[in-house]
């Protein structure tokens, strides 16, 4: 008798970028309400504008239990955390949208893309301790040193020549 048992459906995260994959996952979760959704390599859902991320967030409402796993350090950008945490529970961070989250934890710089188009890019991050406190209430982190015996990293500098347009764009990013 499988009544009451947790249902597991395994699928590649990339499939959720497709209509067919999203539909299949939705049908499974809908018909098996006692389920768990686990996103491995959860940084694949860090872009709040991506179709895959939007689909994953829609699926969250059909999932009884939700978990995320990642081997990537959290420190790359605090903005990467919003949709990952939102998948787990949209109340964890206390923000109704990515933009309110970004405005709390990031100071941005307007970047001219040319042709009258602009985008906001992070200049620096603020209130990081506050964010870490929120994360500590629902996350668990293990470092490589705590679980793996790896040799020390080797670093080498690589210098790349840029053309004039690349140099100009690079300088805009550094501001």
Where are these regions (language model features)?
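Inter-lobe coupling linker of SF2 helicases/translocases
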Residues: 10-15, 24-33, 50-64, 94-175
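Walker B catalytic acidic pair
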Residues: 40-41
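Residues immediately C-terminal
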Residues: 44-47
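Conserved helicase ATPase motor motifs in RecA-like P-loop NTPase domains
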Residues: 64-78, 86
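Conserved AAA+ ATPase core "coupling" helix
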Residues: 78-82, 102-103
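Conserved motor-coupling elements within RecA-like helicase/translocase cores
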Residues: 1-9
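Hydrophobic "anchor" residues on beta-strands that sit immediately upstream
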Residues: 8, 36-37
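A short helix-turn-beta junction within AAA+ P-loop NTPase domains corresponding to the substrate/partner-engaging
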Residues: 81-97
């Amino acid at each position: 008798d499988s009544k009451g048992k947790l249902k597991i459906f395994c699928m590649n995260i990339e499939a959720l970028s497709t209509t067919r994959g999203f539909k299949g996952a939705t049908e499974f979760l809908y018909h098996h309400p006692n389920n768990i959704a686990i996103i491995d390599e959860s940084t694949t859902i860090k872009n709040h504008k991506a179709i895959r991320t939007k689909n994953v967030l829609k699926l969250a409402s059909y999932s009884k239990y939700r978990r995320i796993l990642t081997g990537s350090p959290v420190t790359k950008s605090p903005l990467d955390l919003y949709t990952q945490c939102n998948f787990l529970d949209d109340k964890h961070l206390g923000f109704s949208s990515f933009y309110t989250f970004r405005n709390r934890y990031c100071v941005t710089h307007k970047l001219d893309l040319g042709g009258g188009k602009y985008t906001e890019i992070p200049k620096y991050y603020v209130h990081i301790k506050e964010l870490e406190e929120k994360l500590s209430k629902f996350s668990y982190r293990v470092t490589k040193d705590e679980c793996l015996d790896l040799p020390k990293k080797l670093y080498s500098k690589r210098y790349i020549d840029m053309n004039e347009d690349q140099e100009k764009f690079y300088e805009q990013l550094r501001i």
